[in-house]
Amino acid sequence: MGTASKSYQYNLGTYHRKVTTANAEAQVWFDRGLIWSYAFHHEESARCFEKAIAEDPGCAMSYWGLAFALGPNYNKPWDLFDEKELKKTLETIEHALTEAKDHAPDSTELEQALVDAVQARVPKGLQEHDFKACNEAYAKAMESVYERFSDDLDVTALFADSVMNLSAWDLWDLKTGKPTPGSRSLEVKGFLEKALEQDNVYEHPGILHLYIHLMEMSSTPEVALVAADHLRNLVPDAGHLVHMPSHLDILVGDYRRAIASNADACLADEKYHNEHGGDNFYSFYRMHDYHSLIYAAMFAGQSKVALEAVSRMERSLPASLLSIESPPMADWLENFSSVRVHVLVRFGRWQELLSLPFPNDKDLYCVTIAMIHYGKGVAYAAMGDVEKALRERAALKEAVKRIPSSRICGDFPNKSNVVLKVGEAMLDGEIAYRQGDYDVAFRHLEEAIKRDDALTYAEPWPVRILSDLSHSRDIDH
């Protein structure tokens, strides 16, 4: 093994896929690129595939990997690329696709099939219908590959990914437990569960990762717990994969384990951050892992863990990162600056909420400012100062109007201005409750629940818990 490979500091486990290359270094870098792509760290994945290409410019699968890593994914479809980023990305992908096609004749039949399929993944235009058409074309192409090579675990994972991206975060109807109309959730469930019966499947990060994403929105998320337990320590330095089991831990109420997995994920993320910094899109996943640790601690009643995680998250989220325009980092990340408010509300730390300063940059920190108004409003209501709570409620309403529709909430893929409508109703309920208008208060909280239920699936907000607590307080009263 060459010097470059020996110096690579990330423990990615042992997963390996042999590709057509006589260069051992190229093979090592290819494996790393593939694992990182399964871990949704697409920038590091692309970097590894570029290293593989540098070692063996004739390896078609390295170009395939580069094109795949730079394309759309479950958390970032084509329409969430900004214009400048999209143009640059498509140029790189198109070059990689050409090179992959040129070198494919020297590859295996399966590799040639993958190279042919990924050609369909590039949109013919830059409109919404172009993105939809290329996603459908790619899924159809991968279906043909799967029909020929259905026992291959990588093919199964890539096919599952292509189909799930047609209905990303909308795979199941959360009210009925049935597949969302038009989705192919049961089909994906069938071939992923077929793959889960194969030998060595529990060493495959892609299958395990996608099965968790598939089942977390279903009415039976617990069926994926075995897969989650195998994924938990499979790729120790891929923070997102270490975090993924906590999606299920939270849903089944295993908050202690959710805290443990997310704590490990944050350490892995910090290891990467210490070497590469935070000026990359993976910072979104890094923030999500902190956020998940915080939420698990909130559900478990562990204020110390939650507040320590908030402080770590805030230290790694400077204004310089939020100011990056392409991709528009403020749209993806600024909402995480507001998470401290949720923690202080959850643990009833009213004086700390009232002492929270407002950021100076009202445009950059528009979500954070709105959330602070929400938190201060709850604090004033809880302390019996209804007049000041109403003042904060009015300020919250105006602050929400200033949030651009492009700002994503921490509960991806929901938008911040939509999610804060839940907060408005919750605050209305708190104020009415303190005014003694219990029926009105509960109607507001029911409205908050209704708005919360209308959101696209994401890690849960504790609206129902708040409503239940309020009813309990009324009974005690």
Q: Language model features by range: what are they?
A:
Residues 202:
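Soluble catalytic regions of membrane-associated enzymes that act on cell-envelope
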Residues 205:
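Active-site-adjacent "gating/activation" loops or surface patches in catalytic cores
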Residues 45, 93, 156, 188, ...:
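Solenoid-repeat scaffolds in large eukaryotic assemblies
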Residues 301-328, 334-477:
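Helix-coil-helix junctions within alpha-helical repeat/solenoid scaffolds
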Residues 256-273:
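Flexible glycine/proline-rich, aromatic-decorated loop/lid segments
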Residues 2-58, 63-151, 158-198, 208-218, ...:
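Short coil/linker segments at helix-helix boundaries
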Residues 42-43, 135, 185, 220-221, ...:
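TPR-repeat structural position
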